Each structure stands twice: as C-alpha cells, then as structure tokens.
C-alpha cells in the first residue's frame, strides 16, 4: 500500500512541476495590415494608366467586405481595417501588347497590391484594353 501511495504522490508532483514550467500565455500572433485608399467610384481607365504593375485578368472583382473576399483575406492573414476596397479574385497578369494571345474573358483590372500569387489582388480599378 505504501508503494502505491508514494507512486501517486510522485506522479502528482511531477505533473505539477511540468504544469508550472509551461507558459500560461501563448506567443502573440503577427497580423499583416494592408492599408489602401478608400474606394471611390471610378471610371474605366485605359490600360496605359496602370502604373502599379501588369494589367490583371481576374475571374471576379468584389468588395473586400464580400464573404468570398473576406474569407480569402482572412486565410492569408490580410487585414483591411475600416475600408471596403475592390479586390480581384483569382487573377493572372496579361500584357497589353499582343492582346490577341493574352485575351481576358473575365475582368481586366489594374490593382495596387498584387503580391499574393494571383489568389487575390487588392485595390483594383477596371481597365479597358481597347482604349
């Protein structure tokens, strides 16, 4: 009986020491905050006006507040605080020269932030390739 009581006591002490050694607060997570200018209704611009990178062909362009865009932004850890900006979903760069081979059957846009491997582009403005 003494052996079992001492084993139980030793086990309780061991668990107490291990619990005391573990940190109580987890390490804080880092959140990426992307700040863009608030979206204003804009007219379609000519492709030559895209100064932020290549013209993009996006499957859809939605508000950053839409469920699909919010989900992707959240999964990527991107926070757009207090603004609703147009974002392009599933985008590929296209060249304006030689449009015949690089046509876009979806929406052509010029976006401010295209650094997410085509999954999402932030701050998009519609582009007219025929201008």
Curated annotation (Swiss-Prot):
Disulfide bonds join 50-110, 57-104, 58-91, 111-124. It holds the Pfam family Hydrophobin. It is found in: Secreted; Secreted, Cell wall. Glycans are attached at residues 115, 128. One of its GO terms (molecular function) is structural constituent of cell wall. Keywords: Cell wall, Disulfide bond, Glycoprotein, Secreted, Signal. GO terms for cellular component: extracellular region; fungal-type cell wall. Residues 1-21 form the signal peptide. SMART domains: HYDRO. InterPro entries: Hydrophobin, Hydrophobin_CS. Expressionn is switched off in the fruiting bodies but abundantly expressed in the vegetative mycelium of both monokaryon and dikaryon. The keyword Glycoprotein applies. It comes from the Eukaryota. Self-assembles to form functional amyloid fibrils called rodlets. Self-assembly into fibrillar rodlets occurs spontaneously at hydrophobic:hydrophilic interfaces and the rodlets further associate laterally to form amphipathic monolayers. Belongs to the fungal hydrophobin family. Aerial growth, conidiation, and dispersal of filamentous fungi in the environment rely upon a capability of their secreting small amphipathic proteins called hydrophobins (HPBs) with low sequence identity. Class I can self-assemble into an outermost layer of rodlet bundles on aerial cell surfaces, conferring cellular hydrophobicity that supports fungal growth, development and dispersal; whereas Class II form highly ordered films at water-air interfaces through intermolecular interactions but contribute nothing to the rodlet structure. This is Class I hydrophobin POH2. It comes from Pleurotus ostreatus.
């Amino acid at each position: 009986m003494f052996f079992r009581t001492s084993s139980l006591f030793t086990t309780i002490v061991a668990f107490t020491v291990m619990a005391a050694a573990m940190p109580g607060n987890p390490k804080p997570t880092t959140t990426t905050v992307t700040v863009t200018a608030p979206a204003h209704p804009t007219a379609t611009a000519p492709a030559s006006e895209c100064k932020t990178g290549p013209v993009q062909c996006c499957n859809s362009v939605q508000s950053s507040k839409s469920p699909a865009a919010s989900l992707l932004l959240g999964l990527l850890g991107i926070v757009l605080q207090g603004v609703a900006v147009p974002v392009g979903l599933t985008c590929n760069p296209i060249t304006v020269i030689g449009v015949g081979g690089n046509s876009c059957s979806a929406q052509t846009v010029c976006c401010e932030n295209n650094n997410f491997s085509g999954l999402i582009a932030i701050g998009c403005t519609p582009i007219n390739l025929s201008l």
